[in-house]
Each structure stands twice: as C-alpha cells, then as structure tokens.
Amino acid sequence: MPVFDYEDIQLVPNKCIVKSRSEVNTKVKFGPMTFKIPVVPANMQTIIDENLAVWLAKNGYFYIMHRFYENERVDFVKNMHDKGLFASISVGVKPAEYDLIDELSQKNLVPEYITIDIAHGHSDTVINMIKHIKHKLPGVFVIAGNVGTPEAVRELENAGADATKVGIGPGKACITKLKTGFGTGGWQLAAIRACAKAASKPIVADGGIRNNGDIAKSIRFGASMCMIGSLFAGHDETPGDIIEKDGKKFKTYFGSASQYQKGEYKNVEGKKLLLPYKGKIADTLREMQEDLQSAISYAGGKELLALRKVDYVIVKNSIYNGDML
C-alpha cells in the first residue's frame, strides 16, 4: 500500500461555493452526540482534568477523561451527570477495571462514552473488555484502541466496539517507534486510510497531528474524530504549573507510557517535554474551527464530509513527523 504521513500530503482544492468561511459547518455526530469540531484533547494526565472536562462538555466539545485517577471515575461520572453533562471516561484491562464496570452498572451510573485505552489494542484482553462493557452497560458508546491495522479494526468492531482509535506511537511524547521498532510513526495517515477502508464504524485518528491542517487531512482519509495531545498542551486550563525558563513560559507535557506517568523506569515508551505556554484553550479551539472552515471551503463544500471527496498529492516522506528528536 502507499505509505505517507501528514507532512507528505497536500490536498488539492476544488471550486469554492461559499461567500464566507463562516457559512461552513464543522459539526460532527459522534456516537449519541454532536460536537462543534471533530477534535478531542488526548486523554492524558497533562492534557485533561475534571475542570477542563466540564468546560469542554458545557461548550459543545468532545472530551475523554484519562484513567490515571482510578478510584475517582465513579464519582466523576456522577458529578458530570449531576451537572447535566455527558460523561466520558477511560478504562484499562486489568481485573480492577472489570470491578469498575460492575460498580457503574450496579449504581446505574452509565457514562455516554467509555474508551478502552491500551497501547496495543489488538489483543484478547481488549476484546474481552469490550464484551464485558457491552454486557454490563449496553447503552455505552465504546471506543477501543489503540490499533494500527485493518485486521485489528475488524476484530474490535466484531467484538462490539462502536469506534476504534488508530495510532501506535506517532505522538510527540511517544517513543514507541524508537524503543520497539513497531508503530505507525511516519505512516500514521496511511494507517488511518487503510483502517478506515476496513471499518464499518467511526475511526479516531490518534497521534501525529502537528498542525491544524492535519485535522482536515485526517478527515479526508477516513477519520471521524481526531485525538490531539501536543497542540492542546501548555494552556491555562491544562493540568500542571507554568514554568519560567530564560524569560519564557512553558508547561510540562509527558506521554502516558513515560516514567513520569508510571512513577518508575519500566517498559518506558514515552518522554517528557517542555512546551511553550499558549494561553486560553478557547482561543486554540476557535482557531482550529476557523482553519477547518477554511479547509472545507477549499474542498468546495459547506460541511465536513466535503473533505472526503478531494484529490491529494504525495510530496515526500519522513519517519519523524517533523519532530526534532
């Protein structure tokens, strides 16, 4: 199959049919709900916390709460529902996670979304968890991942997943491709294309997005939602303290498989970065929406799916997604 990534692709414009990009609709239906843009901040401890989840839900954006405060997830679901907001949580596949699903079922606390969040999601452990969630909480929209092949997408969909998350190691804070030799780093966009062709349900593109134009490219090649970490790191609302260095402001960003997340140096496939402070997350989200509106206007449409119909050219290839390692 052709191998390419975000920086290797340029989309080819079609005739514009709108007078202003403000006419363009970027909304996406994903599961039971519709959101302003097809973007979700990564479910990482340096990106999302409960306060930001509340803000995103109130303002029409999708979110997925991370799974690293294991004992707080039941209360989180209750708190979100008490506020009249949707609940979206992450789970792993260890035995305690089965107990969590059972507890949610017993208390009739049914989150609208559950994401099974595993580095290598093409596994029996994930398939078993999908089946358990669907048995205990049949109304939940289950996102399963992460995977990188059409075969994995088919298996997880057949097990009952409502969406699959595609991306093995292309993230800015991820070094899986260097530590293991495996992954979709350098061909993430081609992996999305291959997985989307095999899928009958939505695909979440996870990792490797470095610029707002990459969102449009993800949609073009079959994604319904884009999970983004590094572009959302460093805002007022993201967790962590502002650090000053040489007169400039930064915030910490680390991968979910880094030693900083794990608390020990064992099976480490993530790293820690200092990213520039970016101010308010609302400004970043608004810019993403405006850039996506412009992209759709270049595609010759008024709605998101117009991007699926455009032609493209392959210009070059690089394994590092533009990162300086």
Swiss-Prot record:
It comes from Ligilactobacillus salivarius (strain UCC118) (Lactobacillus salivarius). One of its GO terms (biological process) is purine nucleotide metabolic process. InterPro entries: Aldolase_TIM, GMP_reductase, GuaC_type_2, IMP_DH/GMP_Rdtase_CS, IMP_DH_GMPRt. This is GMP reductase. NADP(+) binds at residues 203-226. HAMAP family: GMP_reduct_type2. It catalyses: IMP + NH4(+) + NADP(+) = GMP + NADPH + 2 H(+). CDD domains: IMPDH (cd00381).
